[in-house]
Amino acid sequence: MNHDYHRLAERRHHAPHDVLGAHENGDGTTTIRTVQCGAESVAVRINGGEPVQMVPAEEYPALFTATVDYFVDTYNFEVTWAGGTAATLEDPYRRLPTVGDLDRYLIGEGRHEELWKVLGAHVVDGGVAFSVWAPHAAGVSVIGDFNGWNANQHPLRALGSSGIWELWIPSVSAGAHYKFSITTGDGVRLDKADPMARLAEPAPATASIVVADSDYAWGDDEWLAHRAAVGVDETMSIYEMHLGSWRKGRSYRELAVELVEYVQELGYTHVELMGVSEHPFEPSWGYQVTSYYAPNNRYGGPDDLRYLIDSLHRAGIGVIMDWVPGHFPKDGWALGRFDGEACYEHPDPRRGEQPDWGTYVFDFGRNEVRNFLVANALYWCKEFHIDGLRVDAVASMLYLDYSRDDWLPNQYGGRENLDAVEFLKEMNATVHRECPGSLTIAEESTSWPGVTAPTSEGGLGFSLKWNMGWMHDSLEYIQRDPAYRSYHHNEITFSMVYAYSENYVLPISHDEVVHGKGTLWSRMPAGSAWDKAAMVRSYLAFMWAHPGKKLLFQGQEWGQTEEWNESRGLDWHDLEGWEGEFHRGISALTSQLNKLYHSELALGQDHAPEGFQWIASDDSTNNVLSFIRRHRGRELACVINFSGTTQENYRIGLPQAGTWREVLNTDDVQYEGAGRVNGDLHTEPTGSHGMEASAVLQIPAHTARWFVLES
């Protein structure tokens, strides 16, 4: 039996181009071979002449051959199938490799920063060039709706030792559905979605979809120029939202109208989108990604997502997306054991599996895997103009013993994942270099040093880090009965001990309103809606006055009563009727907090210790906090009463004498409070709290008041 034919039949051939197509024999003859699965007859028309009938090989009947005694320049196959269906086909095996030597070198070195332009599926020259990295495969084919999903029809060739396989197939176009059919070293067939697919079928279907390069006409040049000009010190108020449940059933195009109007009205500077990358399991909220380069197809195509982002940018709103480079699901048709062996994941399960989530962990030390992830970060920033990446579960990447009893130390015997550290540094440095003004934000729950320090100084290089300590402590405090808060006063003050150790975001995220945790509204210990609303308002005012960027999950901006559930839309009815007056008041306060946050310079000094000064951090008896925020000569005094008792004639020290104008009172009637507004403060030459000037004020229960010094 012909050895090449045998390997083609078993889908184990590394070089099908050496067999298929036209090949000179050295004696003046040329043999042409083609695989046409299911064909009844095949003829080849050479140099425009009469068709030459081809003969099926005895060892492999799907392979047809013809030998002629003249030079072959151009040719096509004329194929007839059962029932008389016929077609004229161009030969895919006439072409030179579609992945060049330089591309292969850069991929092998882990340095190809535009990987999506090389691997995957690309419409070119009247067909599609397919390529995939599968280093352990014995053979790779493309299957799709263009070849009856037959794994023998279109075998790919391996390009040297790069692990890359490729084939250009004529007459395939955008919209075609496909997978890579991989034959493993032990002969098992695996049909896999394309890791580099730029579009995927919505679940439960699992095929990849060919897309043409986008010609979307962006209109956000002004925004991108602004983004590049401002630094991390710019005020940032982030609205975190889940694409599928903000308003159920909305498309990207519909969100481009409704979401933009809503976010503008509330005064947010950014939205953070959950579930942008394609994921099959909706209850995963987008944290078990199967197609890293494909936008979520439930709400529209790639250009529809571009339209949403463009619309937000034109409205002056930045776009952050959740990005999950730490782990990926074990679905058999996706990245896991991609070519039959550990490929994207670490081969040792002590490093390659995440027991908490039942997922695989990327092999950050492998060049091609690191390249896949770094290029993916750039892909979203360049191709979709994403302004920031919120990197999920960073702690699980940094520590080899994260949530593991059985773990493998690094080469120095430590618990630090040194490969992950180097990957994060490279990713951050590359994104910041290639996409001016882009942000990277770490969800990191430990005290790892230098998360937001520059890579040039040995840090990880993130722009910002979620302040998980502030979030946990402040929520623990606020859900206590006011009568007992004085015994836990440190929970509301401790965050200022480390507030300037990193560049922080204060997050009230999706994780805090699910799985029985309740919502901001339901966490409040009060029984009446009046008191609950007052507590939510005072807490939000504390959050907006505290150093750090702001992040609030959808629904918390009005105090949604029920926990978030991704399977349904938000409870917008909370805002309706007379019962919704307190929720409308919280919404009005959120809008005003955002306006003041952006207009009062003192509130924007997030990352410099000189921007904050305690007035009184130790008044646990009365559950009152008071402090100064300052920037460029502008000073703002914040006083918050977390107790259930109105503080009459409460004296606070102030750093300067004069009139302090009230700019916020959460008890104002416009926020559905009682309207106990005392107006401006006039200082007295009486020392208090170590300051020469002071003033006396009334602070209603569960109320925050802000004052600015009149110039």
Swiss-Prot record:
HAMAP family per UniProt: GlgB
Example of a GO MF term: 1,4-alpha-glucan branching enzyme activity
Location of the active site: 392, 443
PANTHER family listed in its UniProt record: 1,4-ALPHA-GLUCAN-BRANCHING ENZYME
Gene assigned in the entry: glgB
Gene Ontology CC annotations of this record: cytosol
Name assigned to this protein: 1,4-alpha-glucan branching enzyme GlgB
Pfam families attached to this UniProt entry: Alpha-amylase, Alpha-amylase_C, CBM_48, GlgB_N
Function: Catalyzes the formation of the alpha-1,6-glucosidic linkages in glycogen by scission of a 1,4-alpha-linked oligosaccharide from growing alpha-1,4-glucan chains and the subsequent attachment of the oligosaccharide to the alpha-1,6 position.
